[in-house]
Amino acid sequence: MFNWRRSQLSCLCASTLAVFVMLALNVQGRPANISALKGKQPNSKEDNEILPPDHLNGVKMEMDGHLNKDFHQEVFLGKEMEEFEEDSEPRRNRKKLIEIFTKVDINKDRSVSAKEMQRWIMEKTEEHFQEAVRENKLSFRAVDPDGDGLVTWDEYRVKFLASKGLNEKEVAEKIKNNEELKVDEETQEVLESLKDRWFQADNPPADQLLNEEEFLSFLHPEHSRGMLRYMVKEIVRDLDQDGDGKLTLAEFISLPMGTVENQQAQDIDDDWVRERKKEFEEVIDANHDTIVTMEELEEYMDPMNEHNALNEAKQMIAVADENQNHNLELEEILKYSEYFTGSKLMDYARNVHEEF
């Protein structure tokens, strides 16, 4: 289970392990993503919306293999997460957290059980799913200008390159005439990755066209079992250094390329190793055989897996369960508000029972 109160000794162990990994392996950098291209100034808001997001709300791992550091808040707060991010006033956030507690506490016994938390996690995950569906409708319209409900790879490619600053009409004409497109190496690499992903999202019988549902899977692989499997394969491919299609602990915690130049960078590396080691050993490696298979990683990544939701509920409760009764009381959830919401409530203990 996750331990919110980390010991100082774990830092030393993580440092030692990090050094071992760097010496023992030909360490590869963390997998690349399309963030750099997203950082380029888009021509409009729609331009960024046609790119698959690096971050998937309610999914434990990012598209590039990083752990989702906001996962707990996402599955606890759902669409309310933005409200906590935008409003840093402790008293208002405290009131909102109390309101959430009352909603999670279905039987109104003033405590939250693992089953109640599991149900809540599934509800919040579904909220993220529905938000992705709504956003996808707008994104699909942006790449389907003729409104026929189907998008070809070439149509998408035109919109994508236009979002990178190329003239849309010129690009469309060159593609129509099979002329060479001159783009920088980074853009070409992303195009090739997107093309592979595009055809993976094309459900059988393959027609090289994506409808709105398939386009949703293209942007959000968590909505399709097949695309989730594809995402897992991509992550394993980027981390798997010996090519056996599985992940060892050493491969999973491989550090970024580069020499640690200062203490701050060393601390970042220590956190990287410690967090990934814990997640690998205690959560992802379901049968605890020290190897993570694609099947195990796929189960771990599936946001609608009820067994995962129950385990997550138990882990979240364990973080704040100071009286060890396997339930969460209001006082506990307020005290550990930073874990659940990302916001620290300095006055959590004041008048708890009165406001409740």
Curated annotation (Swiss-Prot):
Positions contributing to Ca(2+) 3 binding: 240, 242, 244, 246, 251
Domain of life: Eukaryota
Residues the entry annotates as binding Ca(2+) 4: 321, 323, 325, 327, 332
Entry's localization field: Golgi apparatus lumen
GO molecular function, one term: calcium ion binding
The keyword Glycoprotein is assigned to this record: yes
Function: May regulate calcium-dependent activities in the endoplasmic reticulum lumen or post-ER compartment.
Annotated binding of Ca(2+) 2, by residue: 144, 146, 148, 155
Keywords: Calcium, Glycoprotein, Golgi apparatus, Metal-binding, Repeat, Signal
Signal peptide: 1-29
GO CC annotation, single: endoplasmic reticulum
Cited Gene3D superfamilies: EF-hand
Entry protein name: 45 kDa calcium-binding protein
GO biological process: calcium-ion regulated exocytosis; sprouting angiogenesis
Glycosylation-annotated residues: 33
Annotated SMART domains: EFh
Pfam families registered for this protein in UniProt: EF-hand_5, EF-hand_7
Amino acids binding Ca(2+) 1: 105, 107, 109, 111, 116
Family designation: Belongs to the CREC family.
This protein's record includes keyword Metal-binding: yes
Residue ranges occupied by any EF-hand domain in the UniProt entry: 92-127, 131-166, 232-262, 272-307, 308-343
